[in-house]
Design a protein with these regions (language model features):
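Catalytic-core helical/loop segments in enzymes performing group transfer/polymerization on anionic/lipid-linked
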Residues: 1-417
Length: 417
């Protein structure tokens, strides 16, 4: 906005930090997308920095020395990983995990972790974050979006070595699905004992509402707390107003996800059920990193002949217009409840079910397993009035996410009260 950087997913926290006179240094992780690369990212960061923001890109901290060191560490890790696997009794690797017949899967995961890309990425990320903490003095807090990914463990491990006085705050910013195994370790694995073998976790693991807090608390994270759901605060306005339907013609909104295979299954089912959109509109909204155009082309589906519509507007605008939403593993399912949409969730035989509504204490959704089920359910709900549904759903959404726009919990955490 006007040459200044605004964090779309964290604007309320950004504004609160400005209000509290807490300076911000942004560290960006590059995701090559839509023609952007490291060079263009650094140029953009510099242009925004000239307007008063302090923005750094992870790629700026790469050096020949770092890459050589990372390569040596990786070779050492390969020797240890391969040697340990070769000399270890394989029954030890499967005894408490699975059966002996699953050893090929265990071997694949072992090699991927100790030899493959995950190992290389982890080492490079760790060395990069050590350079980051060396280069930026007197960091009070390090706040990041927590999804329990490997780079987060690299960040926390590097912080303990280079900047132990810095407090890391991992903010769980969307939803937590019970089948998202990266969150659900054994309790002994997440116990912090001030030992080098401790799992590198943030100093504060911040959930964004009562439901996710209770779910994560089952694992007994010792540093678990709660704050407001800054990405979803806009829903408080939606829940407080009377719903007014913005379209006279019913709309089925189909929401794609990150996984291309799952998105392809989603589109295929819609096409088999409704090869042409006649009585109601069918809109398709893709995930940013998984554009739908190429998937339609691979499936041989002509969007124009089917009378489908590809939409790119903000999800809130689309949900306000939609009558029903067809969505697999996505936070959009919860947002659709806030807008009073009928939610239809597919259960594909070759995809793990990761929809947040399935885990929550909410039952007003449809779980379908076949094209016939999907077609019948859409025809049953697409023309229904949404007012009653919306009223019934308000309390559920407010109980799932903390939607207090005044941010009292965030204020106390940022001020370390």
């Amino acid at each position: 906005q006007q040459g200044k950087f605004r964090n779309k997913y964290g604007t309320p926290i950004q504004d609160k930090l400005y209000e509290l006179n807490i300076p911000i240094t942004w560290l960006m992780i590059l995701v090559p997308y839509n023609g952007h690369n490291l060079e263009s990212a650094i140029k953009l960061a510099k242009r925004l920095s000239d307007n008063g923001e302090k923005i750094l890109v992870m790629g700026e901290f790469v050096s020949i020395r770092l890459l050589l060191k990372g390569t040596l560490w990786w070779l050492f890790q390969v020797a240890k990983g391969v040697g340990f696997y070769y000399f270890t009794d394989k029954k030890i690797l499967t005894r408490h995990l699975t059966s002996q017949e699953c050893l090929p899967y265990v071997k694949y995961l072992w090699q991927h972790s100790f030899v493959g890309l995950s190992c290389v990425a982890g080492i490079i990320d760790y060395l990069l974050y050590r350079n980051v903490f060396k280069s930026i003095p007197k960091i009070g807090d390090c706040l990041y979006y927590c999804e329990m990914q490997a780079w987060e463990k690299a960040l926390n491990a590097a912080k303990k070595i280079e900047s132990p006085a810095t407090r890391t705050l991992g903010f769980q910013h969307t939803v937590v699905e019970r089948n998202h195994y990266k969150y659900f370790y054994h309790r002994d694995d997440v116990r912090q004992c001030n030992k080098p073998t401790d799992m590198p976790l943030p100093d504060l693991l911040i959930s964004n509402g009562r439901f996710t807090h209770s779910l994560l608390n089952e694992i007994q994270y010792s540093n678990l707390c709660q704050a407001e759901a800054v990405r979803q605060l806009y829903l408080s306005n939606i829940l407080d107003k009377e719903y007014v339907k913005s379209s006279s013609r019913p709309i089925l909104l189909v929401v794609g996800v990150l996984g291309q295979h799952e998105t392809m299954s989603l589109i295929s089912m819609v096409y088999r059920a409704f090869p042409v959109a006649n009585q109601f509109d069918i809109w398709f909204k893709g995930y940013p990193c998984t554009p739908l155009e190429s998937i339609f082309a691979d499936l041989g589906i002509d969007v124009n002949e089917s009378n489908y519509k590809m939409v790119h507007s903000d999800i809130a605008v689309l949900l306000e217009a939609a009558s029903a939403v067809f969505v697999p593993s996505s936070t959009v399912a919860l947002e659709a409840v806030a807008f009073g949409c009928s939610v239809i969730i597919p259960l594909f035989p070759d995809t793990m079910l990761m929809n947040p509504l399935v885990d929550a204490a909410y039952h007003d959704y449809s779980l379908i397993t076949s094209t016939d089920d999907f077609k019948a359910r859409v025809e049953d709900v697409i023309f229904k009035n949404r007012d009653a549904v919306c009223e019934k759903s308000k309390e559920f959404v407010k109980n799932y996410w903390n939607l207090d726009k005044t941010l009292p919990l965030w204020t106390r955490k940022l001020l370390k009260n």
